[in-house]
Amino acid sequence: MVKKKFYWKTVFKNISQSKGRFFSIFMIIFLGAAVFSGLRNTPYTMASSVDTYLNNHNYADLTYIATLGFSDEDVAKVRSLKGVKKVVPCYQFDALFSHKDGKSGVTVYSQDHYDQNMLDRPEIVKGRYPKKEDECIIDVNLGKYNYKIGHTIELSNDNGTKTYKIVGIVNDPRYISNVDRGTNTLGDGTNSGFVEVLNDGARELGLNSKVAQLRNNDHLYTSLLV
């Protein structure tokens, strides 16, 4: 008992005589434990946040892209598969848009309609969803080219040229990064952002006439959201 009492007396005496060193050691241990706890929980927190974000925006489980397109019969077959709850035929293609410094690439997406229940629902930053075939919503990143609501944007590719009126500025769940927008098959290969339109406004640029002739069907889609 005496030895134990003497031991603790010695410990506290040493601490009181070297407060600075004791405090430094304490802080090193505390910070190390805090950093370790943070790093250990970060993956789960990030995964949970991303999962919640994607669920809130009805992120599609699968995206099918066909070089020869999807007919209405193809869509019906996919829709009949076991476990498939929803199939959305649409267009996805690359295009170039003009600005004061030249032309840059964008990816164009489309759907039959835009509402709160759609798959891959864009998040409106400003404006509204398109309601007419000559209306579009644009990537918030395209604001650096001074595009604003009410302006028109001209898109072109090997299938032709079409002009759309900008009615909304959005973020899209398909792009988690605020910087990287992928690559483009046109121009210099870089992608500056995305533009989204209605299917009726996308068919002209999205469907290659040679593919339509090959399949003897001018009502084809280039991608399916499932």
At which residue positions do the language-model features occur?
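Membrane transport/envelope proteins' first extracytoplasmic loop
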Residues: 2-226
